[in-house]
Amino acid sequence: FYERKEIKDMMAYLQVVNNPADEIRLRRIINQPKRSIGDKTLAVATEIAQGIGETLFEVISHADEFEALKRTSPKLLNFAQIIQELMKAAEDETVSLADLYELILEKTSYIEYLKTEYEDAPRLISD
């Protein structure tokens, strides 16, 4: 069960919401579902982050401030905004883990992604 891609993706989302500096999991989810943020863009953002001593998430959150990321900054900023909204929800003591999970599915359009990518989406969604 835990080896399935969609489970790993959701676990990675929860972990990034808890710790946005988790670059490994951030890289896993930045294009899940697809957001057209390429490896080259991530490499440039990583290089910037290392150069200025910030996390990859911080650079993504301020992508419009970096000339090398201007072209893809709307996509990066959109992703960062989703994560920031989820982080804010996670800090709210009235939001349960189940609520946060549902919010991740909603904000990321992950259910729609599963429906378009997998024939057995109804089974995946019910799990």
For the regions a language model picked out, list residue spans one by one.
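Conserved helicase C-terminal RecA-like lobe
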Residues: 4, 11-127
